[in-house]
């Protein structure tokens, strides 16, 4: 991804912007891709299930309700995401294994880190519209992330491809 979110936001005013309240934990600060969505709460079984699918340069956006009590992604799932071809994962919640996460060459954004693991019950919803920080995150939209924030567009901008 060469284009910056600030420049693209100016070019595409219809885009929705999420402020950079997220911290970068992965090996790439900039990434882009079509969005898959997931709504869970302190349970990451569905996170694993979705990341086991071929990522094809997509970005998984996980709405964990902003909970910082348990981690929805750690080193094992981050490596799985990379091996399956995901461009990145955004977690509106917490992650763990931060030292391992830095070694994985994909975008990994989350609100914070915590050592506590999550439940594994499989509760949640896949590919549903999300509302995060007042912004609608739709399955199939195109997400671009860099140090200035996250930009959501209905379609990929000209010349921008999925990946990091």
Swiss-Prot record:
<dbReference type="InterPro" id="IPR005493">
    <property type="entry name" value="RraA/RraA-like"/>
</dbReference>
<dbReference type="GO" id="GO:0008428">
    <property type="term" value="F:ribonuclease inhibitor activity"/>
</dbReference>
<comment type="similarity">
    <text>Belongs to the class II aldolase/RraA-like family.</text>
</comment>
<keyword id="KW-0456">Lyase</keyword>
<comment type="function">
    <text>Catalyzes the aldol cleavage of 4-hydroxy-4-methyl-2-oxoglutarate (HMG) into 2 molecules of pyruvate. Also contains a secondary oxaloacetate (OAA) decarboxylase activity due to the common pyruvate enolate transition state formed following C-C bond cleavage in the retro-aldol and decarboxylation reactions.</text>
</comment>
<dbReference type="Pfam" id="PF03737">
    <property type="entry name" value="RraA-like"/>
</dbReference>
<feature type="binding site">
    <location>
        <position position="97"/>
    </location>
    <ligand>
        <name>a divalent metal cation</name>
    </ligand>
</feature>
<dbReference type="GO" id="GO:0046872">
    <property type="term" value="F:metal ion binding"/>
</dbReference>
<dbReference type="GO" id="GO:0008948">
    <property type="term" value="F:oxaloacetate decarboxylase activity"/>
</dbReference>
<feature type="binding site">
    <location>
        <begin position="74"/>
        <end position="77"/>
    </location>
    <ligand>
        <name>substrate</name>
    </ligand>
</feature>
<protein>
    <recommendedName>
        <fullName>4-hydroxy-4-methyl-2-oxoglutarate aldolase</fullName>
        <ecNumber>4.1.3.17</ecNumber>
        <ecNumber>4.1.1.112</ecNumber>
    </recommendedName>
</protein>
<feature type="binding site">
    <location>
        <position position="96"/>
    </location>
    <ligand>
        <name>substrate</name>
    </ligand>
</feature>
<dbReference type="GO" id="GO:0047443">
    <property type="term" value="F:4-hydroxy-4-methyl-2-oxoglutarate aldolase activity"/>
</dbReference>
<dbReference type="InterPro" id="IPR010203">
    <property type="entry name" value="RraA"/>
</dbReference>
<comment type="subunit">
    <text>Homotrimer.</text>
</comment>
<dbReference type="GO" id="GO:0051252">
    <property type="term" value="P:regulation of RNA metabolic process"/>
</dbReference>
<keyword id="KW-0479">Metal-binding</keyword>
<dbReference type="InterPro" id="IPR036704">
    <property type="entry name" value="RraA/RraA-like_sf"/>
</dbReference>
